[in-house]
Amino acid sequence: YSPLALGILARPPGWAPQRDTALRSSLYRRLLPGSEALRQAMAAIGAARGVTQMQVALNWCRSHGASPIPGFRRPCQVIDASQALNWTLTEEERGQLDQLSVESAVRMPNNPFQSA
């Protein structure tokens, strides 16, 4: 389980990866185009609320009863994620994201970094 889909859901629409690990780059190339509409909606919700796209993604997880535990690379990401606890999505926002997720052309692998 990856609440931010390995960071995909925190990436702004139109974002392209820099050089990264071969596995992560491969995943990004596969997942980014198919998640564009969903990420556009998350960016729009974030802009309307004055919050980040990461906060929208984490709130979307929380709206389904999950307690997301994202991984962080930088301290600023911890602060950003903690701000997601200060608000919740409306039913309309959640419904929009749910529908776009169903319509998405790609699915996140179960756990691409899990060892056997």
Region annotations inferred by a language model:
Residues 5-6, 63, 74-75:
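Short, solvent-exposed loop/turn segments at secondary-structure junctions
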Residues 56:
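Glycine/threonine-rich phosphate-binding loop and adjacent beta-strand/alpha-helix elements that clamp
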Residues 59-60:
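Hydrophobic, secondary-structure "cap" segments at the distal end of domains
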Residues 1, 68-70:
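Hydrophobic faces of well-ordered beta-strands that scaffold small-molecule active sites
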Residues 17-48, 63-66, 79-116:
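Terminal-tail/helix-coil boundary detector
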Residues 51-52, 74, 90-91:
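Helix N-cap / loop-to-helix initiation motif
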Residues 1-18, 52:
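Aromatic-lined glycan-binding groove of carbohydrate-active enzymes
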Residues 8, 77-80:
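Phosphate- and divalent-cation-binding pockets in alpha/beta enzyme and binding domains
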